[in-house]
Amino acid sequence: MSAALLSSAKARFDRSQTRRALRSGVLSARGRRARVANGVHILAGHHMGATEIRDREVFRDLLRHLAKQARLVNIESASRLIAQEQEVDEPMIAFTFDDGFRDCYSHLAPTLEEFGINAALFINPGYVGADAQYVESFNRSVVDLPGKLPMTRDMVSDLAGRGFVIGAHTIDHADLTSSDEDLLKHQIVDCKSAVEEISGTTCDWFAWPYGTYRHISSVALELALDTYDVVFSSDNYPQYSSHGGRVQNRRHFEVDWPQSHVRYFLGQGRSFGA
């Protein structure tokens, strides 16, 4: 690569880092003053962070902090209130986690249980219990998290027995922008029975990978709505639901985010729309 190209790439990287730092500073400043808004909040994370032992303490501290401003509730209760379009006069928070990483079992679930709540865990059956080659490819090419491990099938079954909701997240964390019927049937419909076989429980919930409407075709969304009782996005969070109330919207977060950032996003009100 020429010196000019290297210089240009470095300049773009520096600008990106500057924008990121400025955004973080704004969120921190606003979040320090924010309080969790009244309403039902569903947070959507993925894993416990890069340093799992430390981040279990970070997650515990976050839950303690949020519990001072809101009622932490089981995910079924939160979803039911949204489905019934019930306005609430207090802040309520529930949790979901996608992909099926092993730290959901070893760190996340026990910490949630300390606070008397569960979560919905949306798993990729192709990843759970996969061989080393599949895991390495998934970590590198799909989620960009080298070194992560998936839960085993026994771990998923155990969590289901402990009251965690096990949902579907496609077989292979597929981008569902396709309209190919065979691909969509495999990733959406076949995923339901695959999750049920692993968990030993009925799978009625689905969250599509990447979570935004630009990552799912209208054909794929209709198939998901026909296959599952509840479908979740990670888009359009100010609205409780989308697509005529058939899709419930979650707010992305991660365990290792600063508390002020999480509080900032939870300080935004929600509505059922017109």
Regions found by a protein language model. Give the residues of each.
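Active-site glycine- and acidic-residue-rich loops that bind
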Residues: D99, D144-P150, R214-H215
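A short, Lys/Arg-enriched amphipathic alpha-helix followed by its capping loop at the start of a domain
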Residues: D61-Q69, T111-F115, R162
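C-terminal active-site subregion of NodB/CE4 polysaccharide deacetylases
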Residues: M1-T96, R102-D103, S178-A274
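Histidine/lysine/aspartate-rich catalytic loop segments that bind and position anionic ligands
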Residues: M151-V156, A160-L183
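Generic enzyme active-site microenvironment
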Residues: T96-F97, G167
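A short alpha/beta connector and helix-capping loop motif
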Residues: H107-P125
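Glycine-enriched alpha-helix->loop->beta-strand junction motifs that scaffold or abut catalytic
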Residues: E113-N118, R162-I166, L225-V230
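Aromatic- and acidic-residue-enriched segments that line the glycan-binding/catalytic groove
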Residues: G129-G147
